[in-house]
Amino acid sequence: MQRLAPALRQDNVPLDLISLIKTILAATKEISFRVSQGHLGDVMGSTLDENIQGEVQKQLDVVANELFKDILLESGFVKAISSEEEDHSVAGDENGKYIVSFDPLDGSSNIDINSLIGTIFSIHEAPKDIAAGDDDMFKQAGDKQVCAGYVLYGPSTMLVMTTGSGTHFYVLDRTHGGFLLVERNVQVPADTQEFAVNMSNQRFWQAPMQNYISDLLAGDTGPREKNFNMRWIAAMVGDIHRVLCRGGIFTYPADSRKPEQPYKLRLMYEANPMAFLLEQAGGLAMTSEGRIMDIEPNSIHQRVEVIMGSKNEVEKCLSYYN
């Protein structure tokens, strides 16, 4: 099995970007260890604080965020970072070539029940004409990403990443401490009989999504004439990983619970990186109005509707909106 750096060089990834990726992964290795320690590592439970999203922070959220901040800002590779846990972007090296957006611990509500969690990251080139620390630096569409990926802390620690030359799977070799390539050019099946959605919000959805899900639930006696299974891990990294492995559709649709905030997932460090990974694997990543990676961001914490996964099923879902 091929090690990370040679695999990236094979895809003609620039050496400075390889170095930045390795820096990010150094932080994820430490997080993986902390996660594996569980209660023994004294990082379980919640803090008394809320992040910018209004979410109560888990202790491991804070630990993971500080790890990423420290290692990235000291690297010299990044001009600025933005995190789910930070109100604004944080300035790095004014001469840094890249900017990094990340969710240090996706699915943190799963920590205390020992279920799937992960880290999501997205890398863009840094604009030269905007000062480090200015949030406007991050207002770039997803199709300008130079790298995106996530690290899934499960039975094994897996890296799923793309630099624009396909989506590849790596596994952390704990014996030697490096990530090894285990599957190159993953392809998402175009058709599926699995869907992932938080059904507890169904009554708040718009009519097109209500109708689409109702037809899935009707199974082989309904208009789709086949049965569908529902899966829901409550961590985007876990649900998208299943889609990448065996197909499916994942959606977090618009809802009316909070009219001033109809969307749940964040564009910069959740939707965009997952969209890049899925498109590179032959899938689709959309809102009900268009392609996710075409969206021009208006803030680093912007939220969006998400409909992504197997190509034919995403297109079928979108047909309900026409």
From Swiss-Prot:
GO terms for biological process: fructose 1,6-bisphosphate metabolic process; fructose 6-phosphate metabolic process; fructose metabolic process; gluconeogenesis; sucrose biosynthetic process. Transmembrane segments: none annotated. It is found in: Cytoplasm. GO terms for cellular component: cytosol. InterPro entries: FBPase_C_dom, FBPase_class-1, FBPase_N, FBPtase. It comes from Colwellia psychrerythraea (strain 34H / ATCC BAA-681). Mg(2+) 1 binds at E84, D103, L105. SUPFAM superfamilies: Carbohydrate phosphatase. NCBIfam families: PRK09293.1-3, PRK09293.1-4. Substrate binds at D106, G107, S108, S109, N198, K264. It is an enzyme of class 3 (hydrolase). It catalyses: beta-D-fructose 1,6-bisphosphate + H2O = beta-D-fructose 6-phosphate + phosphate. Belongs to the FBPase class 1 family. Keywords: Carbohydrate metabolism, Cytoplasm, Hydrolase, Magnesium, Metal-binding. Binds 2 magnesium ions per subunit. Gene3D superfamilies: 3.40.190.80, Fructose-1,6-Bisphosphatase, subunit A, domain 1. This is Fructose-1,6-bisphosphatase class 1.
